[in-house]
Amino acid sequence: MFERSSGILFHPTSLPGKYGIGTLGKEAYAFIDFLKKSKQKLWQIFPLGPTGYGDSPYQSFSSFAGNPYLIDFDLLIEAHLLSEEDLRDIFFGDNEEYIDYGAIYNQKYPLLRKAYENFKSSDNNEMKDSLENFKRENSSWLNDYSLYISLKNHFNRLPWNEWAHDIKNRENSAMQHYKNELADDIEYHNFIQFLFFKQWNDVKRYANENGIKIIGDIPIFVAADSSDAWANPEIFLFDEERKPVKVAGVPPDYFSATGQLWGNPLYNWEKLKETNYSWWVERVRANLSTCDIIRIDHFRGFEAYWAVPYGDETAVNGQWEPGPGIDLFNAIRSQLGELPIIAEDLGLMTQGVIDLREATGFPGMKILGFAFDSGEENDYLPHTYTKNCVVYTGTHDNDTLVGWFQKAKEEDRQFARDYLNSRADDEIHWDAIRGAWSSVACMAISPVQDFLGLGSEARINTPGVASGNWQWRLKQGVLTNELAERIAKLTKIYSR
């Protein structure tokens, strides 16, 4: 179902700009122009949801809401919601290449609150009508999300399972009480979501008009502290106190003797099946309205997932439990039609996972950055690919190509040189990109860092390291016409 194509992986928070973090303003449109000049058809991003502690897009307060950090202030000035004076002398961080999330948190929300107060006192009836329409169309998730965020602030940012018992359990009287008490806060968060989706939908429309599709991302699990978990406790494995019975993780392996303890709540798949997986159907539906294609993270968890007893400090005592399998995807497909989905099928693969991916028809993933272990044959080398896969030079979880090459064992470096017919180490990233683009994979994608030949300083995430992630930003002016022409030439040669 996917045409031969290529694209760039680049999350909007990493866009350059003057407000400390990438936004959905003019730099987003300039990046789409760069994609078009480069003859790219795909822009891949991370999940767009609101981020919390650790700033990871993969641990969001909602599977449906948008990240307020991405709202562009210049567009709010154009809409007469803020003035240039409001933004004068505000500290958004002092390094244009790294996001200072503390500064963003401290400055962004007061400015968005000011925009909301200006909106309330304005006579912009057209925008007020648009907000009411937005609330109606998105009520299935928005009502719970805006109440959840308002409650979270009310309870000093505590996770929902530490709130007062009556509202933690969503008792009717408590729900009504807090909806009344926090009414203005709730409307403020409705307004923020309205702004986000207005700006995002305009960006997406511009991309589509220029022949570019956006690939979004769905983490399989939701965050423990999320409106999803608070508002839908029946679809998770919680006890009577709304504490998880078991949580998600990954078993011990060659890289980790204790495995990985992710801590996300696990789904009650039996309960979900009773509703024909309606929550998952709505989640996919929402993501396919904000993006054109979606990558589903940890696809193997739909075949079987590692369930760890709640309270354990490592993942050692977990066990495999069966996922919903093809039944889930049949239910989604029967309600939404053909599914433009990429299956993230990395990690521990079994025949059962391979069979499930083949039954869905979804393309899996190949990571070229994993291919050059000289000690063993592996299926990340391009000559092993089939058409129904997506090749990445790297993802958010691994080092840049140049960073990998600088740290790799010499025999692995030499294997990469030999395999890619590389004549100069300072061109290794281009030789790897050529290897991906020339392959039979239906889609080829490279992080923007690899096109620029950046090293480990531009790595956006190091799994298992708690701080310093998701901060990297692109410098202004590095996406040149010369770079676009070089990418375009490669793309034309290999009919992408």
Q: What positions do the PLM features span?
A:
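Asp/Glu-centered strand-loop micro-motifs enriched in Gly/Pro and often flanked by an aromatic residue
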Residues: 1-4, 9-37, 192
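Alpha-amylase-like alpha-glycosidases and glucanotransferases acting on alpha-linked glucans and related
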Residues: 2-4, 11, 55-193, 197, ...
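Catalytic domains of carbohydrate-active enzymes, especially glycoside hydrolases
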Residues: 26-51, 290-291
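Surface-exposed amphipathic alpha-helices with a cationic face
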Residues: 36, 200-208, 333, 357-358
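Domain-scale activation on soluble regions of proteins
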Residues: 37, 167, 174, 472, ...
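Outer-envelope exported proteins of Gram-negative bacteria
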Residues: 46, 213-215, 219, 293, ...
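Conserved, well-ordered alpha-helix/loop/beta-strand core segments that scaffold catalytic motifs
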Residues: 189, 194-222
